[in-house]
Amino acid sequence: MLWSCAYTWHPTTTVQQVRGRILQQDEAGTNLPDKMRGWYDLVGGGAGFLLIETEDPGEINAFCQPYMDLMDWDVRALIPQEYRAAIKRFRKEV
């Protein structure tokens, strides 16, 4: 399953804190680099999202928790859609 993990830094969070925490968690082996399918920052900084693929939602919790003092998370499971198949289905349903 693919998960969107959107983050927004707390107002007092600094770039040094975030970079330090990322390095700390990388050294601890908890950043799930093999399961990350994308890492995107929003223009302007302080927010972005990661795409993580795992069947275990507990892995998402374990990934996000060490960052919760620095940022808020909005985590959602994603359902893939194939455009042409969706349009065909919509035409039948409408």
Task: Report residues per predicted region.
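Conserved, structured core segments of small domains
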Residues: M1-V94
